């Protein structure tokens, strides 16, 4: 049976990738359908109740700068906000928020239900309609066919999902949800490279059974940070603390004594788990010299008693989970509400993707989220936004777009995935970016909002606020440049008290702000340089741009040099064995990867600068390079 409407873009899956993909496509004016197996789970936080963190918060800010939903949702659902690395430089500062799961999910659903150009439909997808290597639509479990010009798959851990608790296993996409078996089988028929990954979640605890009097409280920041560039502290619900406890030698003894009942150590689980979020049994065995691990006790919301013990993800049997939990301080009488478990699922080698998230083998088919081997809500949201945008552009027969590595962490993400692939769940860190001084949380809008507006992702309200911020910054910098003080000026004594060494020559406000000991707040407290900007975001930008001007200029110069051949196209049908001078190893890697540009080719492991030079000569020879460009 054929559905009575045709769509421009279909998004399959309503998690963090799917919601951003559907909204991005709809925001650009394309008729979009979001298919989910259960509308009640739209925007559900399947694992930890938190958004942000090192590297991850940067992605959330970038998604927000391009009109995405995640930052606004957490601003309305966050019950504790903190700035991580607050004492360090601006490049590595990151925002993190605990979420009320129910508030977060409700905000996402409300936003989706009221989004123009977006239709929701509850049905699991079992098959793709593919004709002559181009996707034409999907077929649902009940046999209903939907046609579209582009399809985005954001299926999370549902493809061939298998849940493990001890030596028992069952099929499932997550606890309480069925897996997607038919679609997994269908995708395995297509020419994609497929493998298995694993992730896990800890048992949930009833807060009424915990003795908080012996636990260390961890409070959020005051004033609370805000995630969205459109956000406000008044959007935040009531703020509450988290708590800290620790495992101990008794905990570790319980784990060691029961490893034979662990599906990981019994060889039942074959998928590789996340390196930076290991299970408690993995931590105990890998770090045998440590007799204690810190566990963060995170409330799941304002209207529930459930607690999320961050740090004891496990797939050990339930009776062992009870022993582990009750061995920890404050948890001696703890009641487990939901058992922890591990889940194995299919993922597809992201080297089979273009930089637009379109698959190389099926035109119009896009992948986003855990299907690409990533882990984390934030990584999923970033991929979803870009895949939804590019599916929209594809449906309009327009050229796709993806940010470069020097423009966004979203660019680092797709570049890493599509050039290097991954053998384990990929997580974003600031250390993955070569130009992280330019890719700060605070300037995500300055980097991306103008381009997002051009692409149709940014509405008038966000655009107006962005332009007001730019105006405020420019006017304030001009004011500080043109305001001077000299050793004879009124107020010099007050100024000198703020300086390490007294001022001995005339200086502008910008000159003084460049001094390491001087802050914008201190400078504008002086009568000569008052008043300070009311726009705190613009004020922060003024201070960072002035203080780090030299370093920023140096990184920009480095980027300019490295971009000479970044976008030089490589023919899709080029047989690299025809290129004289390339080694057999390089030929094999290039023929396998089929990189779209020289820049992408240069980042494939084993591709040397000499090989890139040979490719430049070959491109000139076949007329795809302008004379002199190979020496540019």
Curated annotation (Swiss-Prot):
Cofactor needs: FAD
Keyword terms: Cytoplasm, FAD, Flavoprotein, NAD, tRNA processing
Positions bound to FAD: 13-18, 125, 180, 370
Subcellular location: Cytoplasm
MF-aspect GO terms: flavin adenine dinucleotide binding
GO cellular component terms, A-Z: cytosol
Claim: DNA-binding is one of the keywords in the record: no
Any single GO BP term: tRNA methylation
Binding site for NAD(+): 273-287
The organism's place on the tree of life at top rank: Bacteria
Function: NAD-binding protein involved in the addition of a carboxymethylaminomethyl (cmnm) group at the wobble position (U34) of certain tRNAs, forming tRNA-cmnm(5)s(2)U34.
PANTHER family: GLUCOSE INHIBITED DIVISION PROTEIN A (PTHR11806), PROTEIN MTO1 HOMOLOG, MITOCHONDRIAL (PTHR11806:SF0)
NCBIfam families assigned to the protein according to its UniProt record, in alphabetical order: mnmG_gidA
Family: Belongs to the MnmG family.
UniProt subunit comment: Homodimer. Heterotetramer of two MnmE and two MnmG subunits.
This protein's name: tRNA uridine 5-carboxymethylaminomethyl modification enzyme MnmG
Organism listed in the record: Vibrio vulnificus (strain CMCP6)
Lineage of source species: Bacteria, Pseudomonadati, Pseudomonadota, Gammaproteobacteria, Vibrionales
């Amino acid at each position: 049976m054929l559905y009575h409407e045709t769509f421009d873009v279909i998004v399959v899956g309503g998690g963090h990738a799917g919601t951003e993909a559907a909204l991005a496509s709809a925001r650009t004016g394309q008729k979009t359908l979001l298919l989910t197996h259960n509308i009640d789970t739209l925007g559900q936080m399947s694992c930890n109740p938190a958004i942000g963190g090192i590297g991850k918060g940067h992605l959330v800010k970038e998604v927000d700068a391009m009109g995405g939903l995640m930052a606004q949702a957490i601003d309305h659902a966050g019950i504790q906000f903190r700035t991580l690395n607050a004492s360090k430089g601006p490049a590595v500062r990151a925002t993190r928020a605990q979420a009320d799961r129910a508030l977060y999910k409700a905000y996402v659903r409300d936003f989706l239900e009221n989004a123009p150009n977006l239709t929701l439909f509850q049905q699991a997808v079992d098959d793709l309609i593919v004709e002559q290597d181009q996707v034409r639509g999907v077929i649902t479990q009940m046999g209903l066919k939907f046609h579209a010009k582009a399809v985005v798959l954001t299926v999370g851990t549902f493809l061939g999902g298998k849940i493990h608790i001890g030596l028992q296993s069952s099929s499932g996409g997550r606890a309480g949800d069925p897996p997607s078996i038919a679609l997994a089988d269908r995708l395995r028929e297509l020419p994609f490279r497929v493998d298995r990954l694993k992730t896990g979640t800890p048992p949930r605890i009833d807060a009424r059974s915990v003795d908080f009097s012996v636990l260390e409280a961890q409070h959020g920041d005051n004033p609370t940070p805000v995630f969205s560039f459109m956000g406000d502290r008044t959007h935040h619900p009531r703020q509450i603390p988290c708590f800290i406890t620790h495992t101990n030698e008794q905990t570790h003894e319980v784990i060691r004594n029961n490893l034979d009942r662990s599906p990981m150590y019994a060889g039942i689980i074959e998928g590789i788990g996340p390196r930076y979020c290991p299970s408690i049994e993995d931590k105990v065995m890998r770090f045998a010299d440590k007799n204690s691990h810190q566990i963060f006790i995170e409330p799941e919301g304002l209207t529930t008693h459930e607690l999320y013990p961050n740090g004891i993800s496990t797939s050990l049997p339930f009776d062992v989970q009870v022993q582990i939990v009750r061995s920890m301080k404050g948890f001696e009488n703890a009641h487990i509400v939901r058992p922890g478990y591990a889940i194995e699922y299919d993922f597809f080698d992201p080297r089979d993707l273009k930089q637009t998230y379109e698959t190389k083998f099926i035109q119009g088919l896009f992948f986003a989220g855990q299907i690409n081997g990533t882990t984390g809500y934030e990584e999923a949201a970033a991929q979803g936004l870009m895949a939804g945008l590019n599916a929209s552009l594809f449906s309009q027969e327009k050229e796709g777009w993806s940010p470069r590595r020097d423009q966004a962490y979203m660019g680092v993400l797709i570049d890493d995935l599509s050039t290097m692939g991954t053998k384990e769940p990929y997580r974003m860190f600031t250390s993955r970016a070569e130009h992280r001084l330019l890719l700060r949380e605070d300037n995500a809008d300055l980097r991306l909002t103008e381009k997002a507006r051009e692409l149709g992702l940014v509405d008038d309200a966000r655009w107006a606020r962005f332009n007001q911020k730019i105006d405020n910054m420019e006017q304030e910098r001009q004011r500080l440049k043109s305001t001077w003080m000299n050793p004879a000026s009124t107020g010099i004594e007050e100024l000198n008290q703020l300086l390490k060494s007294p001022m001995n020559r005339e200086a502008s406000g910008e000159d003084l702000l460049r001094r390491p000991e001087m802050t914008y707040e201190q400078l504008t407290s002086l009568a000569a340089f008052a008043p300070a900007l009311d726009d705190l975001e613009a004020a922060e930008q003024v201070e960072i741009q002035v203080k780090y001007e030299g370093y920023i200029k140096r990184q920009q110069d480095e980027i300019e040099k490295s971009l000479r051949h970044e976008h030089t196209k490589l023919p899709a049908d080029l047989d690299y064995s025809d290129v004289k001078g390339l080694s057999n190893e390089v030929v094999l890697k290039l023929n396998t990867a089929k990189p779209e540009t020289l820049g992408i080719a240069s980042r494939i492991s084993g591709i040397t600068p000499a090989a890139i030079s040979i490719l430049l000569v070959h491109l000139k020879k076949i007329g795809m390079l302008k004379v002199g460009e190979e020496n540019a």
